[in-house]
């Protein structure tokens, strides 16, 4: 939405756009999510959001044993679960449709599972890399393992797979974001996600 007004959203919807996102806005807030859902409810359209509380997201890897072992600044798992909880609370309050793009923690799986039990209109996806790689990979300092959301623990992988099997997670996504070679051939902390 970042600067787009509602008339533009209506025009885009009339042209065939089926969903809108705030995912790349660093200004995402409770107010932005609420206003987005209010606007999109009027045209029965989906909001896609990337669950990340920016105030906790200035690290480069999952916060935990491996980030501490190698001395890389961690992104705490609550960065994701706080955003999921917040957005679902807003969804429950005003209604609408929301899709979480890129869940990676067992807490998020549990919260979304509960929301689906309450019949909230929520879907989500998991990046394929969060299903096959865990945060132990960062000990290599290979910048290719600097991804968003960060690689999490083996317990998270187990919960994500369970979420796929029980229908909590709707989509396995690539989350492929092509990078210029120079943005990955550098120190881990300076590399792009």
Regions found by a protein language model. Give the residues of each.
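Basic, amphipathic juxtamembrane/active-site segments
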Residues: 182-189
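Active-site anion/phosphate-binding pocket segments in diverse small-molecule metabolic enzymes
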Residues: 174-181
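Aromatic/His-enriched, Gly/Pro-containing loop or helix-boundary segments
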Residues: 1
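Gly/Ser/Thr-rich active-site loops/lids in small-molecule metabolic enzymes
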Residues: 80, 189-193
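Histidine/acidic residue-rich metal-binding segments in metalloenzymes
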Residues: 4-172
């Amino acid at each position: 939405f970042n600067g787009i007004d509602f008339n533009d959203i209506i025009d885009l919807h009339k042209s065939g756009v089926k969903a809108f996102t705030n995912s790349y806005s660093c200004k995402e807030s409770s107010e932005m999510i609420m206003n987005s859902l209010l606007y999109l409810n009027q045209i029965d359209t989906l909001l896609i959001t990337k669950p990340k509380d920016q105030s906790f997201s200035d690290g480069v890897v999952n916060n935990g044993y491996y980030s501490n072992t190698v001395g890389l600044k961690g992104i705490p798992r609550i960065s994701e679960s706080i955003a999921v909880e917040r957005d679902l609370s807003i969804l429950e309050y005003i209604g609408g449709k929301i899709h979480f793009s890129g869940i990676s923690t067992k807490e998020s799986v549990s919260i979304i599972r509960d929301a689906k039990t309450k019949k909230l209109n929520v879907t989500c996806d998991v990046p394929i890399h969060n299903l096959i790689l865990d945060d132990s990979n960062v000990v290599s300092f290979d910048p290719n393992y600097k991804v968003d959301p960060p690689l999490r623990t083996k317990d998270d992988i187990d919960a994500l797979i369970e979420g796929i099997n029980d229908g909590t997670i709707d989509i396995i996504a690539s989350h492929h974001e092509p990078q210029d070679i120079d943005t990955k051939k550098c120190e881990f902390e300076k590399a792009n996600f």
